[in-house]
Amino acid sequence: MPKPRVVHFLGGLSGIGEDLIYKLVCNNNRCSIVDTWYDLFVSKMSTELEIFSEKPFLFNPDLVNSNDLLLFFALDEKTVDLDGLAGIDCDVIILMNGDSPIEIQDARPNLIYIHDLISYSEVESLANKNLDELFDLCISNAEDFNFPSDKKHWWISQQDVAAGLVRLIDYTTPLPQLMHICGRRGWTIQETFEQLELLYSRTIAGSSGQFQTGHLESKPVIHPTVVKVSQITPSTRPDLSIINEVLVQIDGEGWRPLTPLRTSLMHYLATKDLD
């Protein structure tokens, strides 16, 4: 009888890594954590570990079995040391930032590029260059700025990515070598700023005691505008067909991110010092 599959966590685990570990612990999945993060995460989940039976253990390469899965989080890395993963005798998935593609010649490991991720962490301050620039504009109350009109971001929440990875974990059929993950809807910088500014102003008004009825007015997610056909640029969304097909094979649902942008931005704002 084969041993239960263990999910091994290596790399930079703050953000999506900690979210995924939490989900696995709550599902009583077995997992191990690299030593640099182990004590911090176990301490953070001490309450949950009193309830659920499967406590994460310290990663040991000698305890990796062929039916296990290793997840290497390299979202903040420009390069990945593949030689260090060569001796791992199990399925390996490297998660990388979609803005930092790498080339791999052999069939192992699998790559998942995550584009326009909105992440947050309870253990470390995370940077998001694009959102941080918009956040600075909110703080300065700037009015004289120009955004690129056609560039879109395909924002995806940390929760949706973690939920998708949970579905992949028990899938024993070999995965495609390369998959992309992002949101299904594109947002311009202007549209993103409008959403962030709305949430920021409501948050500041509430914390300062200056909340007014105007802050409760329903605001459209986007403002409808008429654009000439000649000004419409082709979609640059990453290819979601592969991840969608794999998830359809798993449970018939496909890739269906459910978290609204405003919810993701609220998680982002919750990590900021608004005093």
Spans of model-derived segments:
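NAD(P)-dependent short-chain dehydrogenase/reductase
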Residues: 103-167, 196
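N-terminal Rossmann/SDR dinucleotide-binding element
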Residues: 1-65
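Short acidic, S/G/P-rich loop/turn micro-motifs used as interaction or catalytic elements
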Residues: 13-20, 37-40, 75-81, 99-101, ...
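Mid/C-terminal beta-alpha module of Rossmann-like enzyme folds, strongest
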Residues: 164-235, 257-275
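Conserved Rossmann-fold NAD(P)-dependent oxidoreductase catalytic core, especially the SDR/UDP-sugar
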Residues: 69-123
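Amphipathic terminal alpha-helices
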Residues: 2-7, 21-32, 241-275
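Flexible, charged surface loops at secondary-structure boundaries
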Residues: 1-4, 25-26, 61-68, 84-90, ...
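Short, aromatic/basic amphipathic alpha-helical patches
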Residues: 20, 42-49, 82-87, 103-108, ...
